[in-house]
């Protein structure tokens, strides 16, 4: 495998007539949904209103196709993409396919690429080609070969491509190490999407597939495999989560067969059954509880669980029950299919793919309000919600971001349109919102107030 650093021409548009504002120390967004599960630090310059030109600091065209989310470290915005030699693959479209999607293996040569974009200017510093080949695996029309979000520790960036491998690069674009992964079969040929997670010098990777699923840990500095455990699971698309609770640190993995917790050396701690047949949302923690959702739209069982720390063995619910010693509460039908829910303040907010929004008490599961339609004309939602400045934001597949009021009353406060499809969850860095659409990366921020 050869590695090449390629410099290309890019389109960068600076939208402030006064020029790009000087950067101060950035608050990093190092992984999918940031450090705090979608909750960003407040900043008066974080935007609540925008369109394709309003409050846009810059836009940068990103070649190829990728639905991985952007991540931010200092002045570096990292995204991944896969660039095809010819534009012959079926185009994704917003909304639900209901079995009408095309699943194909491309016959064109592809390049798997990591991009480093300057947060201050929007210019691409470098792009690193990690692989050039014909794709060996099919994918769903709506998926991409670059749907796994990278992760960074502020020194290195780690990129995972399903069926290709795991790569570590420094901030100059040099490949420090790589681990090739064998081709595996994903359910219905839909491709992969589970992102890696980084914790105290270790990278954790889950690869649930229809051949042999596994979870593994790698040394972040050297790439050495520390351990690998096979899993009795079929294909899932949920990323792992390291839960640091008041008793221990544990690696949480969800699956359509079981939710499993491992210690950080790969020993199984506890597990439970009772998920939908496809699992996508990422686990996260708040208020001392672990939140797990699994909501495949075709299933009757679409559960959300709140788990207490300290469990061991099988903690599956008995038939007809919703709680036990370690399940603080559960609900059988409130989970989303793609988006990961959000806990802000006392409430668990759930964005459903078909454009409904719900709120429940995060500690008890009590319904605050049931399904509320966000907009009658929205095509669907895949991106996960985020919050700052006491406003919740949800991004539709059409590229429309709806601004919602948090609290006990549902209210839509505004709508911001970029006019292009997106599935990626945005990043937030200090005073800026970073949104990835099908072809572009946007930095959006309120102008600095005149002194």
Model-inferred region functions:
Residues 21-451:
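Noncatalytic, solvent-exposed loop/strand surfaces
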